[in-house]
Amino acid sequence: MSFVIASPEALLAAATDLAAIRSTIRAANAAAAVPTTGALAPAADEVSAGIAALFGAQAQSYQAVSAQAAAFHDRFVQLLNAGGGSYASAEIANAQQNLLNAVNAPTQTLLGRPLVGDGADGASGPVGQPGGDGGILWGNGGNGGDSTSPGVAGGAGGSAGLIGNGGRGGNGAPGGAGGNGGLGGLLLGNGGAGGVGGTGDNGVGDLGAGGGGGDGGLGGRAGLIGHGGAGGNGGDGGHGGSGKAGGSGGSGGFGQFGGAGGLLYGNGGAAGSGGNGGDAGTGVSSDGFAGLGGSGGRGGDAGLIGVGGGGGNGGDPGLGARLFQVGSRGGDGGVGGWLYGDGGGGGDGGNGGLPFIGSTNAGNGGSARLIGNGGAGGSGGSGAPGSVSSGGVGGAGNPGGSGGNGGVWYGNGGAGGAAGQGGPGMNTTSPGGPGGVGGHGGTAILFGDGGAGGAGAAGGPGTPDGAAGPGGSGGTGGLLFGVPGPSGPDG
């Protein structure tokens, strides 16, 4: 076969020559326009006048055709210039790629990893593939692939080398955990976010229990400078078949185990929230148990300078019979930076509580270290509605989470979280559940004010209504300077 070689220099030179020819032709046409279009009749007779008019009309037609030819000439010159530029750009790109391949060849051969470049994304499928690692010197990690086969976790995100961001973890298949986020660059880069856990399968037939939701993936840790990746959310539990239990929700990814901020600077990653429990199936003689909600993950800690990540929220239990229909716990906030940074806020607790005593399910605010304010406590979940298993009494509201402590040198304590409301009675003759107690305010150490106490919650409606919960106590002020925090209002 024949080969064609395009030289960008030759194309650009031809375009320049054509432009010069165009200028010469235009000058000649302009010079000929006046004498040809304005030719005078040599005599006053009709024949002379007709000949002059014929020559003038022909000259005008020539000028019109010349204008069209000039426009075509201009377009042709533009196309030649564009073609030459395109060929030149392609040659530069090929040269860069060849240079990049030559640079990456030694490390790719010895270490199985390029020196410069982004990692490839993992393929999605029955088993999600992990993302490729970024270049040793520079490059982002590839994202993990999503899984589709039941119970299989998503692919992990690829890690960066010296500079770059970690890849996102893939989402889990039904009932499978989310993939972990990739690590950020050792020098600079953010950690990748964890993947989302898959939803549990619903029960099949009369005897099928709902499947549990998958746990969320862990957020990726940053290196020296960068923010930690967020943890993935847990999947919801599946619904139970007739008379069978619903699946429990998956837990949120823990930012603490991978979502920490950079050692020098960076915020901790936010934790994922827990999934909701699946609903119980309804049977002829008895109902199944509802699934529990998943716990929220803990926020990631900051390094030297940075803010702690927020805790994830707890999931709610599913609908259906359960003697202890307890809401899942929210995650604690991450700790602030060693030198400077506020603590992260605690996650909210899931709804649901014991008939008479609420479970402590709100996340606590993260504390500061040297300088910084403590994080606010999470809100407590509401009590569960009354049921036959609880004697018709509504569940107690959950207490609010405690605020984090201020920094050792300076910082205010975090505010306590608000309590959850008591659950309503099963019917108009059943008592409502008591309201929860507000969370305690965080303590200041040397300089700073104590955190305000969280608000107490109202009791649930019923006959009689549930007792209101008291507000949380305020935190202690600093030893050298500061005032105590105010107590929270009663419900």
Swiss-Prot record:
Biased composition (Gly residues): 128-145, 432-480
Family: Belongs to the mycobacterial PE family. PGRS subfamily.
Protein species of origin: Mycobacterium tuberculosis (strain CDC 1551 / Oshkosh)
One Pfam family from the record: PE
Lineage: Bacteria, Bacillati, Actinomycetota, Actinomycetes, Mycobacteriales
Domain PE: 1-92
Stretch list, region Disordered: 114-156, 376-400, 419-491
UniProt cross-references to SUPFAM superfamilies, sorted A to Z: PE/PPE dimer-like
UniProt-recorded name of the protein: Uncharacterized PE-PGRS family protein PE_PGRS36
